[in-house]
Amino acid sequence: MCVQVMLLAGTETSSTTMEWALSLLLKHPETMHKAWAEINTNVGQARFLDESDLTKLNYLQNVIDETLRLFPPAPLLIPHESSEECTVSGFHVGQGTMLLVNLWTIHRDPKLWVEPESFRPERFGGVEAEGYHYQLLPCGVGRRACPGAALGRRVVGLALGALIQCFEWEKIGESEINMLEEAGIVIPRAEPLEALCKPRQTMINLLYDL
């Protein structure tokens, strides 16, 4: 695989996921506070969180999983091709047929999820996301799953966790945050997210020393 393709795919999907996560957290400040409280308890205020902390930040991981459920970075994954003729759920699939997986629909299917349109990170509490048996598939599954999935989760976890740990976030103005999506292979926000952030008083010295 071309290194340039891997880098572009990794940066675009990760940055899009972080923008959606911040949008959801600004829309649900109580969730933002809960994520910050978890970081404060497990990491403290004397240092920045690092990769080794991520395994202790279960609620932060739940926030990421719920963001990926509602706004999968690649809602149709990548095209696959059937290697042989087959029948799936009564549908004939010829050999060589291009196949797409509609993650957006699967992730919002009321047969699979309680209140599928609601942002509820708690739904993943106490359960590994992979344990949702083909319900949560932001990176595909099996041999052809995204090879950068684990790295992407670490990047998003570290970046999002640092933004929550170090800064207080507020939406700008009284109007609701626009959650409309733009069409594309990756689904970005229709409007770039604008928000107000200021350093947390407890983190100013650490930030100053960077």
Language-model region placement:
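Generic beta-strand/beta-sheet core signal
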Residues: 89, 96, 101-102, 198
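Conserved cytochrome P450 K-helix/beta-meander segment immediately N-terminal to the heme-binding cysteine loop
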Residues: 83-85, 101-128
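Amphipathic, well-packed alpha-helical segments that form the structural scaffold of globular domains
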Residues: 4, 36, 40, 64-72
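Conserved cytochrome P450 K-helix E-x-x-R motif and the immediately C-terminal K′/meander segment
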Residues: 29, 48-90, 110, 117
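Cytochrome P450 catalytic-core helices
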Residues: 13-31, 36-38, 150-166
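Conserved cytochrome P450 catalytic core segment spanning the I/J/K helices
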Residues: 1-18, 50-53, 57, 86, ...
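Hydrophobic, well-ordered secondary-structure elements that form the walls
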Residues: 35, 67, 93-96, 119, ...
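Cytochrome P450 proximal C-terminal region
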Residues: 40-42, 134-135, 139-210
